[in-house]
Amino acid sequence: MRRANLTLLFACLILFALNAEEIDTTKISNTFQLGEIIVLAPRTDNTISQTLNLQMNHINVSEALRSVPSVIFANMGGRFEPTIIVRGFDIRGIPVFVDGIPLQMPYDGDIDLGQLITFDYSQVSLTKGIAPMSLGPNTIGGSINLVSFQPTDKVNVQAITGLGSGNTYEYGINAGSRMEKVFVQASYYERHTDYFMLSHSYQPTTYQSDRKRDNSYSDFQKVNLKLGYLAAPDQEFTINYQYQNNAKGNPPYSGIDEKQTTRFWQWPVWERQSLYFISKNRINTNNSIKTSIYTDKFYNVMKSYDDQSYTTQNKKYAFTSIYNDRNLGGNVILSNTSITGNQLNFSVQINRNEHNSHNVGSPQLTNSDFVWNAGLDDRYLINEKWSLTGGLSYARQKSLKEEDQVTDEGITEFPQNSHQAVNAQLSANWIANEQFSMSAYVAQKTRFATLKERYSYKMGQGLPNPELQPEKATHIDISLQYGVSKNLSINSSMYYIRLHDVIQSVDGIEGNLTQIQNAGEARFSGFDVSLYYLILKNLDLTSSYSFIIQKNETNPELRFTDVPKHKVWSNLSYQPTNWAKVSITHEYYSRRYSRSYGIVADEFHLFNLQGSLSWKQFTLYAGIKNLFDTNYAYAEGYPEAGRNYFTKLVFQLN
């Protein structure tokens, strides 16, 4: 019934569009412009289009960004969550936005990027280190913005169906219509995978006795709706609704580390709903205002079972955990261009988040924060060659509800707590000529501690610390872009990051307990180099090398995890005609620590082959992932898929 209703919805949309009046859409982009983040500072191109995601079979956001220099693809094996690490910062320090609206997981800040499917996003954008103050707090390592589609014509339709290894199937549709004053956009996507197969070189273990990876299923369902109204050329209003209903298993640990506990976990429910309103209005010649209001709900059920049968919950470590979280907030950006060559943005953000959790059979506990932020972003064009960009913001976090434990007398609470942070950044950009440009920036960025870091007992192994202060990072970056010739261009960045008051676990508190404290000092330093080389008119090479050193200066014996020193990414693409394309991709990662006490995941090379054929409105994509069936892992004990295949057919009507 649900699929029938969706089919009827899209049919009505198309019929309605066919009867709409014609308008001039030649200058309209299919990228939802109100959803783009205004980045005043200069940057290199860290934007991935949907076209590239289809070609490379990048299903989720973490896969989409793996080609970006200084971005490390990782897999949080203990939770089966693919993610990225940018210049040493994990996802807690790289907030995710959808059309500029914050996508938050209030409790731990660990957004599962594997749950964010790329099909209904026109582009995935990343900033590294420096980010607009208008995004609010916690952008200590950068930001990610997922920009949805908007219709460009009377009828826009994109439909997809595909098959893959492990009994994988997918199908979806994007449909939209633009009229003189109104536009509508709607999409539905569904994907299912039963399992993935390990490499033929994999050696069986106690909890993984064959190549068919245990408990590796996943299901995705998503609906995305948008309604827009253009009152005037400089006045636009949109209301947007997104709904996701996902599920997944968590493959058990199958490594050699005796300290690791094998978990038998499943997430039968991962549900998210977002409703947001965005408007942009020109007040007069020099002033405009952009406003957004949003509400977000997240419902999560996680089941811990007794064993690999995933049927009983009788042992002490077996439980069912339920999260029921909410976010409510808004953002106002006032832009002024009164001074020639200058753009000034003043922004205010507010957010109220609430985390409700309980294990089945236990009472619910609630933790809640209120956060507000005020910021300035300014860019001044000195002349045709030089420009300066500055930013300053102040943020404050205040606890609203701090429930601790349930006792015979009732629910106890932690002390109320409040924290503040100041962020600042300054960048300069020099354009020598059409072939060469340089930029440099210095930034002081912060991140507030999450609810989990402040209040968690770590299943009886830790002590809470409500007074945990924000951690701080000082960034220095120098970048250059050089067009060596019409066929060769090179980009490079060097960076140095100093971290203070690092939020980390400290042992030996009240016996054998641990506590999260502002106890760390660290530094990250590195560089990356990327090039694009047009070898022949139909043959090109894109390649990058990234290097990073992470040093824990407080406790050098504790290693930073999941980040290799060396990464190489290359793509050789051949397009003999305008309807056929084939490419081969190579990735290399040196070894990385999986645990802070020294357990490592070995280095590996990974090759992927993909191609496409186009005919009229149809494009057929197909490929082989892990071409040489490499046995590898991003996290020790959590082996990845061996050789696997995909194919998909896309229909596009513009």
Can you say where each PLM-predicted feature lies in the sequence?
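N-terminal periplasmic "start-of-domain" segments of outer-membrane beta-barrel proteins
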Residues: 26-64, 83, 91
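N-terminal periplasmic accessory domains that precede
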Residues: 61-64, 82-85, 97, 112-117, ...
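Extracytoplasmic beta-strand/coil segments of soluble accessory domains associated
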Residues: 62-105
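Short acidic/polar hinge/loop motifs at secondary-structure boundaries
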Residues: 73, 101-128
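Periplasmic-side early beta-strands and strand-to-turn transitions of outer-membrane beta-barrels
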Residues: 152-154, 162, 178-268
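Conserved C-terminal beta-signal and adjacent last beta-strands/turns
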Residues: 228-231, 268, 426, 476, ...
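Outer-membrane beta-barrel signature, preferentially recognizing the C-terminal barrel domain
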Residues: 257, 262-282, 323, 412-431, ...
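Gram-negative outer-membrane beta-barrel transporters
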Residues: 351, 383-384, 388, 397, ...
